[in-house]
């Protein structure tokens, strides 16, 4: 059992993570960042929940780029094959649930 105060978590580098759980190959990680990630496509599904801060999520569908701002409490679901990149607007803390070892 553990309690994690996500707003207190800060990593040593952007996108640094605290591994919370690995449940039958599904990883749950808390990330801290103040810098954009990179465009990528995950091996499978990804759940991206903003716990603190704001994040501009850019994604491509049928080659067309879209963008939306995720506020604290918002969740982005990336289905397999969804190309996306997260750009925090200041500091952000994000809970990511995905296949262990995914990009």
Regions found by a protein language model. Name each.
Residues 61-80:
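Short acidic-glycine-tyrosine-enriched beta hairpin
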Residues 35, 44-62:
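Glycine- and acidic-residue-biased ligand/ion/polar-headgroup-sensing regions
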Residues 38-41, 45-50, 67-68, 86:
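His/acidic/aromatic-lined binding-pocket segments of jelly-roll/cupin-type domains
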């Amino acid at each position: 059992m553990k309690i994690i105060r996500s707003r207190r978590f800060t990593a040593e580098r952007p996108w640094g993570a605290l591994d919370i759980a690995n449940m039958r190959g599904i990883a749950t990680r808390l990330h801290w960042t103040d810098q954009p990630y990179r465009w990528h496509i995950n091996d499978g599904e990804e759940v991206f929940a903003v716990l603190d801060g704001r994040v501009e999520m850019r994604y491509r569908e049928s080659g067309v780029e879209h963008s939306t701002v995720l506020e604290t409490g918002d969740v982005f679901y990336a289905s397999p094959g969804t190309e996306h990149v997260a750009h925090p607007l200041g500091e952000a803390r994000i809970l990511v649930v995905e296949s262990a070892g995914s990009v």
